[in-house]
Amino acid sequence: MEILMASSNLIKQLQERGLVAQVTDEDALAERLAQGPIALYCGFDPTADSLHLGHLVPLLCLKRFQQAGHKPVALVGGATGLIGDPSFKAAERKLNTEETVQEWVAKIRKQVAPFLDFDCGENSAIAANNYDWFGSMNVLTFLRDIGKHFSVNQMINKEAVKQRLNRDDQGISFTEFSYNLLQGYDFACLNKLHGVALQIGGSDQWGNITSGIDLTRRLHQNQVFGLTVPLITKADGTKFGKTEGGAVWLDPKKTSPYKFYQFWINTADADVYRFLKFFTFMDIEEINALEEEDKNSGKAPRAQYVLAEQVTRLVHGEEGLIAAKRITESLFNGSLGELSEADFEQLAQDGVPMIELEKGTDLMQALVDAELQPSRGQARKTIASNAVTINGEKQSDPEYIFNDEDRLFGRYTLLRRGKKNYCLICWK
């Protein structure tokens, strides 16, 4: 695995991985990194109760910088989360209550923590919350000390805002328009508090980052830098990080480790080697060798399994990975003996389609209710043709009624038609 130690080459190494979309004054930043460790930050606004896959690249970028000896600051936006970032958003965000946002702040801080080392000496990570400096600031201070440094002419010409201003059906409120000032002040504040010299974020944050650079120069006469990572796209043009069920979350209660693992297993061949560069710490040579091996093997590529394993371990730890692989193996082989009650809970959460049934239901009706067959008549034929299994065991009796032995842990039965059509029955 690649540990990015040579700070002067760090930007080039990130570029080789495709992880740099834009950077301000690249030569000066490279020179500053060559002089020794810096502090850098990335902000995470609590717009939900969990981070999602879109946050993973900048979060891992913080980790890459820390591995190279720099000091990462993870800023959770307890204040900015109350306002909402308008950047490239088609419509105004819904405002959440202060209580809700503070709950989300606590959850996101907890989620960020395992990715960074908060106890490693001089480059130990710092967790910050911008509510600490905005919560007690009054409007006059905001307008006099921050607002006077921002030109409205420049603000309305920023691409992220311009798109909203040009839409007839959606303008932009003063609340969202002021977001740029808040994020800009975050940079200036962190520069003063912790000597932060670099902000990283998604490429949609470029306008906010450059505002922070300008404000820091005006308030503190310090040169600071910005670097954006690309917004991840898929080769087929569809949005990355979404499934039919919505976003892929980092919280295991919202997206189970099993479903998370499956998301990566289903990565297209056209994307997988690029994603290995974005989402893992494998070195480039190792990834290129794997690509070459897959091309020449004549078999199904191994890259998806490597990617799924690496990223699931990063996000859910060894235990989450082992559970995800165990469930995958059991479903593939139809042998459920290895599954724990917690594994079934993962499947019930979002692993496979699920229905609740009353005890006494027969097999034909279960197949219809589970939408594995359109009618009892069709279900009868399918059962008789030996195409149905209950908990991995074939059942060919159309009149079969489920019994207590079928209810694993007193609650779960896995019904399968053919090789790939599953439904988990949860008994009432």
From Swiss-Prot:
A motif ('KMSKS' region) lies at residues 239-243. Residues 361-418 form the S4 RNA-binding domain. Its main location: cytoplasm. It holds the Pfam family tRNA-synt_1b. It catalyses: tRNA(Tyr) + L-tyrosine + ATP = L-tyrosyl-tRNA(Tyr) + AMP + diphosphate + H(+). GO terms for biological process: tyrosyl-tRNA aminoacylation. L-tyrosine binds at residues 41, 179, 183. Keywords: Aminoacyl-tRNA synthetase, ATP-binding, Cytoplasm, Ligase, Nucleotide-binding, Protein biosynthesis, RNA-binding. It comes from the Bacteria. It is found in: Cytoplasm. Its EC number is 6.1.1.1. Belongs to the class-I aminoacyl-tRNA synthetase family. TyrS type 1 subfamily. Homodimer. NCBIfam families: tyrS. HAMAP family: Tyr_tRNA_synth_type1. Catalyzes the attachment of tyrosine to tRNA(Tyr) in a two-step reaction: tyrosine is first activated by ATP to form Tyr-AMP and then transferred to the acceptor end of tRNA(Tyr). This is Tyrosine--tRNA ligase. The gene is tyrS.
